[in-house]
């Protein structure tokens, strides 16, 4: 999996650097459900890489039709002969003569035995989960006729390509659609497929325009699936790729498909999730995969920067190193900026919102669990995972299930994810927690103490360790003196980490101490506010706002800093405290959650929170002022913290402990008396779960519209002279009406739903809008 921020174009899907899941069918060769079509003309040895990327697909219900378009080079024919008898799913079709790539594709498509056609060139590569996600996308979205994803260009030219079917009408001016894709067979049958008169390239551009002209179109999944091999001069292979010929061919397209260039383009509206929508129960296939290692399914909300995800990544790393296969499934819409971090250790990663409608989540999970035959399922911070527990238990009564929680959240769902643990503990074999504090919290509220197992998240003490050399280098690069006290605030900049408290504390300390510097490493919704605060209060010389930083840089920042300051609103035990102490930093944090299980008075300060913000600011400021006045104490506490973490909280101890918990979960489950869950009841629970999530998503979207609207109202109220003096009253009224109706169109579908709650604040918005726009 490629890191879009720092792409490694050598780490292709067939690179030995990639983690190996060893996908292959269990038992007999499965019946094909997709047909891969590949034209082959003297490709040669590079074809072995393409073949490897096909053979290692996670979806094994395929057939591969390789159309030999009259190859003549002996070496190329020898390569092709290797695949004639390698696998019964591979069929080499020998054309009577060289007929051109369009004819070769059409020939293979006619020979295909399935309703789904995958187009793949003989020198390109596919990510291992490509076919599986494309197949399920077209199953979940019957209104779309084809699908693809983003592409990685490698070879002579390296770049990332994000355009495709999502670009819509841009296809009329430029061939923005990558060739590799999955299409419904019917589009070829109804349009005739590729133009066989085109033998010099661009036949795929013509195909996309032909399909659009016939009313067919597709969608782009926001993931990298296809690796496109580039050459120094593409026109050496295809004459039509020369700039002049491209311009000429655009004129040809205008003549062939005039209605496209006169304004027509297929508009396909995705079917949105409906109220109380029936949940499909049928799964299309088993896709039973061979298994020779233990397997864990990890259900998480997303893959984003944060302590919980760092723990998940380290767990996946350790388990795969111990011989486990780990599959990761995420359930919330997200850009998943840390997906590549998980991808270092497993390629079996599925972000359900990227390729499935909400209603298809339950049957996909049923299919997925059957396909992989997991030894255990682990749920962590995943609300949908909890809501689907009755369904999972009903479908798989012999499957051990555990969860893992880091912290309670009293102001969200009466306790956060641990509250869901309490609600669904009957379905859990083991309850995992990251602190004794959280264990006590659960037991006090009715959890079965016998089920609870504790594992601290711990830290890599070799990676996070003092480095005088890095300290000097980083400080020199930032213009900071070697003996200058440096305070680090490393966190997501949002309400849970209290950036407003942090900022006011620094402002207070700066008034009495002029010799220290602050580094802020992190991003989040409150970063713009923090930036404004720093500027408005003249703290630019004292505070460096670094934004989100990659993990290697975070290691260096900790090595260059002296004090970690994190005034959290709530925590379990913040992972960044483990990292800071391992790096030799003194820590100043909040006395919340289980943090005193890690931070002792010898290592740092934990400050009691206060309902009075001013008092809380005073408490933190007093601690920091005292430390800055006693630099030797900072160093002493840093050394003590390092010693404590090395002795008690090493990362390998976490890995071993989690393996113990997993083994215990499996053993406990199989020692239990059989439990019987109603399959019908499980499906009913799944329907209720999906309706709950659907309503949540709609309300969240409506709330965002409300916030945007109120921000716009405030801006409109502040700009009383928004209209030029020369505007007539009629012109001004028309503009006001236009803006009002734009707001109404975007917001009021959600207003109507949210108004049912009876909230006076929401119900007043309509009148406020009219008042602001003087209507």
Predicted regions and their residues:
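Boundary detector for helix-to-coil junctions that initiate low-complexity/charged tails
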Residues: 1, 263, 671-775
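N-proximal low-complexity "stem/linker" segments adjacent to membrane-targeting elements
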Residues: 2-52, 285-289
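A conserved mid-protein helix/loop that constitutes part of the nucleotide-sugar donor-binding site
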Residues: 45, 309-314, 485-508, 518, ...
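Conserved donor NDP-sugar-binding/catalytic core segment of glycosyltransferases
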Residues: 129-160
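Acidic donor-binding loop at a coil-to-helix junction in glycosyltransferase catalytic cores
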Residues: 200-207
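Short alpha-helical donor nucleotide-sugar binding micro-motif in glycosyltransferases
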Residues: 548-549, 556-561
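Aromatic "clamp/platform" in nucleotide-sugar-dependent glycosyltransferases that forms part
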Residues: 569
């Amino acid at each position: 999996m490629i890191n879009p921020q720092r792409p490694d174009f050598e780490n292709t899907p067939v690179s030995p650097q990639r983690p190996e899941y060893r996908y292959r069918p269990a038992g007999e060769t499965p019946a094909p459900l997709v047909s891969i079509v590949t034209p082959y003309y003297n490709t040669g040895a590079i074809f072995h890489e393409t073949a490897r990327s096909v053979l290692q697909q996670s979806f094994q219900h395929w057939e591969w039709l390789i159309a030999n378009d009259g190859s003549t080079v002996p070496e190329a024919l020898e390569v092709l002969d290797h695949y004639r008898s390698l696998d019964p799913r591979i069929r080499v079709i020998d054309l009577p003569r060289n007929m051109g790539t369009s004819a070769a594709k059409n020939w293979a498509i006619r020979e295909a035995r399935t309703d789904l056609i995958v187009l793949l060139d003989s020198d390109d590569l596919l990510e291992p989960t490509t076919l599986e996600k494309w197949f399920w996308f077209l199953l979940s979205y019957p209104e779309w006729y084809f699908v693809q994803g983003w592409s990685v260009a490698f070879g002579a030219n390296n770049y990332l390509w994000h355009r495709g079917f999502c670009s819509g009408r841009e296809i009329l001016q430029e061939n923005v659609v990558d060739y590799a894709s999955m299409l419904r067979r019917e589009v070829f049958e109804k349009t005739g497929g590729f133009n066989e008169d085109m033998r010099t390239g661009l036949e795929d551009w013509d195909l996309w325009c032909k399909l659009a002209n016939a009313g067919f179109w597709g969608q782009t999944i926001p993931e990298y699936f296809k690796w496109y091999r580039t050459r120094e001069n593409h026109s050496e292979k295809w004459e039509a790729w020369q700039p002049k010929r491209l311009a000429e061919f655009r004129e040809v397209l205008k003549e062939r498909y005039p209605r496209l260039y006169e304004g027509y383009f297929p508009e396909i509206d995705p079917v949105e999730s409906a109220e109380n929508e029936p949940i499909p129960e049928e799964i299309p296939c088993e896709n039973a995969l061979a298994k020779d290692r233990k397997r864990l399914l990890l259900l998480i909300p997303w893959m984003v920067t944060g302590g919980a995800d760092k723990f998940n990544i380290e767990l996946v790393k350790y388990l795969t190193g111990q011989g486990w296969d780990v599959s990761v499934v995420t359930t919330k819409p997200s850009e998943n900026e840390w997906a590549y971090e998980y991808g270092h250790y497993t390629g079996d990663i599925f972000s359900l919102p990227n390729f499935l409608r909400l209603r298809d989540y339950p049957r996909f999970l049923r299919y997925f669990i059957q396909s992989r035959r997991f030894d255990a399922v682990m749920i962590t911070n995943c609300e949908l995972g909890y809501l689907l527990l009755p369904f999972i238990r009903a479908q798989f009564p012999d499957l051990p299930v555990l969860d893992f929680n880091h912290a309670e959240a009293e102001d969200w769902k009466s306790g956060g994810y641990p509250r869901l643990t309490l609600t669904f503990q009957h379905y859990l074999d083991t309850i995992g927690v990251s602190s004794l504090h959280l264990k006590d919290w659960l037991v006090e509220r009715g959890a079965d103490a016998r089920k609870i197992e504790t594992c601290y998240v711990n830290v890599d003490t070799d990676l996070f360790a003092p480095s005088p050399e890095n300290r000097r280098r980083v400080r020199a690069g930032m213009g900071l003196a070697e003996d200058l006290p440096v305070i680090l605030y490393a966190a997501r900049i949002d309400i849970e980490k209290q950036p407003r408290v942090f900022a006011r504390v620094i402002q207070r300390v700066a008034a009495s101490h002029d010799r220290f510097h602050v580094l802020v490493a992190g991003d989040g919704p409150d970063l713009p506010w923090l930036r404004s605060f720093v500027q408005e209060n003249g703290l630019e010389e004292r505070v460096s706002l670094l934004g989100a930083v990659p993990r290697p840089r975070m290691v260096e920042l900790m090595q260059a800093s002296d004090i970690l300051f994190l005034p959290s609103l709530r925590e379990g035990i913040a992972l960044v405290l483990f990292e800071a102490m391992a790096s030799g930093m003194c820590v100043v944090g909040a006395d919340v959650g289980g943090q005193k299980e890690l931070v002792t008075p010898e290592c740092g300060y934990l400050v009691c929170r206060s309902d009075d913000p001013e008092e809380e600011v005073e408490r933190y400021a007093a601690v920091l002022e005292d430390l800055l006045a006693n630099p030797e104490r900072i160093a002493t506490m840093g050394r003590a913290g390092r010693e404590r973490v090395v002795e008690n909280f090493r990362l390998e101890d976490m890995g071993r402990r989690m393996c113990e918990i997993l083994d215990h979960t499996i053993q406990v489950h199989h020692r239990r008396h059989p439990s019987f869950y109603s399959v019908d009841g499980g499906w009913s629970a799944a329907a209720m779960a999906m309706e709950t999530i659907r309503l949540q998503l709609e309300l969240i979207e409506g709330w965002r519209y409300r916030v945007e609207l109120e921000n716009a109202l405030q801006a409109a109220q502040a700009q009383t002279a928004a209209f030029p003096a020369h505007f007539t009253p009629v012109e001004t009224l028309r503009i006001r009406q236009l803006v009002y109706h734009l707001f109404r169109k975007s917001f009021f579908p959600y207003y109507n739903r949210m108004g049912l709650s009876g909230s006076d604040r929401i119900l007043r918005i309509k009148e406020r809008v009219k008042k602001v726009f003087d209507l």
